[in-house]
Amino acid sequence: MLKILRNFLPFQAIGDKPLSRILNYLDIFGLFQSDPFGYPLLLKRVVIFVAGWPTYWRLAVANKLTIEGGNYLKELPNTNVLFISNHQTYFADVITFYHIFSAAKWGMFRKLYPFYLFSPRAKTFYVAARETMKSGFIPKLFALAGAIMVDRSWRAKGENVQRDVDTSAADNVQKGLNYGWVVTFPQGTTTAYAPIRKGTAHLIKDNNPVVVPVVIDGFRRAFNKTGLTYKKRNTNLKVRFKQPIYFDKDQPLEEIVAMVTKIIEQNVPENIAEWKAEAENLNS
């Protein structure tokens, strides 16, 4: 019970302003707190509350959501936790994480009972492409819930590009880790078996977080690419959390990339690898 109650305690205010610190000590509900990016936690909770009801229906009523390994969330610290997951839709994946994390705050680790939306976990962030989060009203609304927006150096507007790496991304992810939990999709795309980007390995080496591998399935069948429109209802959705791990800070980047690829089960199956090799031979 005490472990659950600690999830409702406010964190120490960020910043040196005396007024900010005084308000924090008096504010047991976190009404005056803001995250490291300046967004009030109250606003984030309102966004999660508003978006949570219709998305709960989509996940747990119109479809069948199964959560495995939720007990691993029990012993996690409140900060410096990095969730790494494969990616199937733009928004349905991360919305599901918000539901699960908010339920875990209330001590629920296997099923979703949406009363947690009255006090959701607001100290959660997710890494997302800036162009995706700026593409309309709904993405902009979701961004307020905790998006750490980055400019992808390899892809823009659906096309492959080459541009300078967004150097601010690592600093912003570090801010998120210092304040709470961060979800990242290390492939940077919803394409299955896409290669893992080295940026994730750099984040792990630089911040030494608790890394929680996650494997999701069924979202691509249930929703369209954005995750906002149904493709097939009554689909089995699965979110499987694996045992948290620490990486050795001295591990080479290539080794971390290989391990991440394996633990989120994104190694290319042999039959697909053979088909790709045959196609390349035919085109050469």
Q: Model-predicted segments: where are they?
A:
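Electropositive, surface-exposed helix/loop patches at the edges of structured domains
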Residues: 190-192, 243-279
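Soluble catalytic domains of membrane acyltransferases
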Residues: 61-251
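A mid-sequence interfacial segment
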Residues: 134-137, 141, 269, 273, ...
